[in-house]
Amino acid sequence: MTQTQKTILVIEDDRDISSTIQSVLSAAGYRVLTAHNGQDGRRLIQGQKPDLVLTDMMMPRMGGFPVLEFLAELPDAPPVIMMTANEGSRHKAYAEMLGVVDYLRKPFAMEVMLESVARAIAAAAAGPKDQPEA
């Protein structure tokens, strides 16, 4: 691979899910960072500048929405994929309003996650998504 290795931050409180996602992403050639709550995730976003964030919605200490709100304030925020078992359409709408590029409902196939990750990274590499309107 001649492409620079992309860094993905996985924010997930369920350690089994986090470990599985980390293994799958690492095997696909990504560098993976993990956090088990939103507070630790925010610190890693600030310190490590990941290329993509995968975050759970419901976590102790700080959930996914405060992470999204934090990212919305950053000028160079990475794209975000939200992972959740929540079926609520209002949650999905709010996540999309905050800029989530994909919304994966648990349980999801790892192949689906890998496709979502590849799309998000390709879209980010293609350039800014919010071009000024004429």
Describe the predicted segments one by one.
Residues 19-27:
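Charged docking surfaces used in two-component/phosphorelay signaling
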Residues 29-36, 44:
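Short hydrophobic/Thr-rich beta-strand motif most characteristic of the beta2 strand and flanking loop
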Residues 36-40, 62-66:
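Acidic catalytic/metal-coordinating carboxylates
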Residues 43, 65-76:
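Short amphipathic alpha-helix used as the core "switch/output" element in two-component signaling
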Residues 48-54:
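Active-site beta3 strand of CheY-like receiver
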Residues 59:
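Receiver (REC) domain active-site loop signature in two-component systems and cognate sites
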Residues 66, 87-102, 115, 119:
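Alpha4 helix (beta4-alpha4-beta5 surface) of REC/receiver domains from two-component response regulators
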